[in-house]
């Protein structure tokens, strides 16, 4: 019995020694938690970058007019506490700092989380549920943090104004990826983005929304009614395609047809109204010139009518 007790005691002692060795090894391998060192320490090595940052909108807030303790950290507010970086003598990727270069190796989630520390409300509320986040885009894909820019959103593209067009910075940034939509803006009938009267963000929120196509409003029609209030109604006589979805007939970014129509009139109308003849004609049309006329010559109130005799949208 004594031998069994001694054996058990020995096994317990060996196990405790083993745990002690493992715990000591983990303690030695795990670096000490990093602490904040302050802006002046960063400036001592990164003077050119610090000078650039001080000229940006965000730099002016963090360095000269911080609103809370978090903003007072400035550099370390985005890159993280720098004590381990300083202790290791600096260098790219040393000390656990978050970096935002394209070749940094940081994941999109890590970079974006640094921004979302402050920018997680308002228009950024739905960022994590949006298509840009799910496709691995980072905030610095569109925004530049270390360069002075006249654009209030610190976008990576600058605007350009000439006598013939006005390239807004927002439109140029979106056009980097959405090349098909950018090309549509140069068609004969187009939204006035290339003239600078609208931007992509007048209709879309690139940071994400609970709505389709990242629309700012709950539906396509509600988005259109923001400007085209005369089309909202309510109407006594409703035209179902117009009531259900404006994009049934219109291509909002640009087309080769008048009034942003997807297909020229009357072919657009006959895609639904495909009877072999018009109700007021005794037989099918025999002249090609019939098809060169517009249905809206007679049915002018095609979006809807409140006239007592407006069943056919003629007035």
Residues of each region from the PLM?
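Short sequence/structural segments immediately N-terminal
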Residues: 4, 16-315
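Bacterial N-terminal signal peptides that target proteins for export
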Residues: 1-12
């Amino acid at each position: 019995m004594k031998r069994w007790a001694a054996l058990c005691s020995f096994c317990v002692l060996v196990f405790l020694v083993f745990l002690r060795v493992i715990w000591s090894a983990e303690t030695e391998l795990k670096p000490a938690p990093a602490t904040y060192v302050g802006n002046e320490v960063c400036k001592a090595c990164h003077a050119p970058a610090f000078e650039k940052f001080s000229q940006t909108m965000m730099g002016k807030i963090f360095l000269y007019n911080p609103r809370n303790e978090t903003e007072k950290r400035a550099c370390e507010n985005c890159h993280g506490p720098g004590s381990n970086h300083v202790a290791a003598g600096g260098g790219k990727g040393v000390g656990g700092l978050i970096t935002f270069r394209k070749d940094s190796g940081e994941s999109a989630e890590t970079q974006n989380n640094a921004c979302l520390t402050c920018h997680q409300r308002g228009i950024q509320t739905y960022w994590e549920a949006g298509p840009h986040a799910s496709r691995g885009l980072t905030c610095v894909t569109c925004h530049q943090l270390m360069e002075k820019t006249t654009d209030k959103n610190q976008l990576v593209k600058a605007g350009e104004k000439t006598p013939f067009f006005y390239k807004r910075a927002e439109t140029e940034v979106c056009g980097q990826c959405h090349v098909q939509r950018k090309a549509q803006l140069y068609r004969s009938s187009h939204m006035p983005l290339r003239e600078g009267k609208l931007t992509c963000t007048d209709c879309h929120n690139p940071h994400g929304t609970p709505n389709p196509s990242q629309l700012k409003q709950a539906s396509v029609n509600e988005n259109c009614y923001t400007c085209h209030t005369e089309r909202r109604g309510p109407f006594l006589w409703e035209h179902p395609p117009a009531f259900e979805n404006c994009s049934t007939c219109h291509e909002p970014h640009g087309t080769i047809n008048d009034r942003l129509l997807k297909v020229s009139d009357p072919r657009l109308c006959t895609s639904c109204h495909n009877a072999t003849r018009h109700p007021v004609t005794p037989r099918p049309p025999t002249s090609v010139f019939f098809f060169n006329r517009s249905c809206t010559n007679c049915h002018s109130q095609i979006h809807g009518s409140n006239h007592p005799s407006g069943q056919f949208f003629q007035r």
